[in-house]
Structures are given as structure tokens and as C-alpha cells.
């Protein structure tokens, strides 16, 4: 099974960077487009992000465990991500969960949330976020600067993103060099 996943990853490794570029630069992502189109584009980008991130083996409690995406307080994004539950990620089924900052069990691989939710999580559950290798994604100004791994943003009427490489390292995540090359900017926190 591992050999098959490695073979598929190697075979299609050239394809995913181009798909990510296409999603980011898609002309239909202008500000004038409907919110539903923008949410669909963000969903595609979130799915593409996961292809470019490597989680440590201990991020999956069991070999058959689901790849879990949590969404805090954003019903539109939760609904947009639900169709991903029919797909697979890194050999795992995908599960979409309506999450909360009060959750005690952080079994998420990706967590989409606001800056306010992230700040609350960092105050109360920072150790769990890092120990569970959670890739945090948000859109608010200052999201990456406040410890989020990826911030989605509109840049010249196109969807782009910022990476906080220190937050990714703290979470034990390995981001592909393709992500770094496509990022609008890369932040590194001071020690």
C-alpha cells in the first residue's frame, strides 16, 4: 500500500503544482464573483494545500484513520467542504467536522477558523494543536502573524496565500517547496 501511494505521488507530483497555480490564478476568482464561487475556489485551494503537506505518521492514530478537516463557526465553508468527504487524501478517507474552540479532542489534520478562534485556541490548546500536527487555515488579517499556518487572501482580485513557516515547523508539518514558491509571502516568527 505504501509503495502504491509513493508510486502515485511520484507519478502525479508534476501535476499538482500546475493545478494549484490554476486554482490561484483562475480568472473567475475576481472580487465581483459571487460569494459561492469564491467559497468553491477556497475549497479547491484547501484540498490542493493538503496535497502539498506531509504529516508525520503519528498524526494518524490508526492506519485506517480518516483525514479530518475541522471548521469553526463558518457554515458556508463547512457546507462547501462537505463534498470532499467523498475523496481520499494521502490514502485516507476525508471527514469534515463542525468544530468548536471548546473541543477537547483535537483529532483534526486541518482546521479552518477565524483569527479570534485561533487566538482562543492558542491560549487554551496550543500544546494540542502542535502535538496533533494541525494545519490551521484562516482568512482574517493577522491570521498568519498570530500563529496560523496558512492565510487565504485576495491579491489583485485573485486568491493567494501567506505561509507562516515557523507555525508549520512548530506543528511538525513539512510543506512542499511548491507551496513556498507559490505563496504571496512567507513569514518567520522571531524566537
Q: What spans do the regions from the language model cover?
A:
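Short hydrophobic alpha-helices and adjacent helix-cap/hinge residues
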Residues: 2-21, 25-191
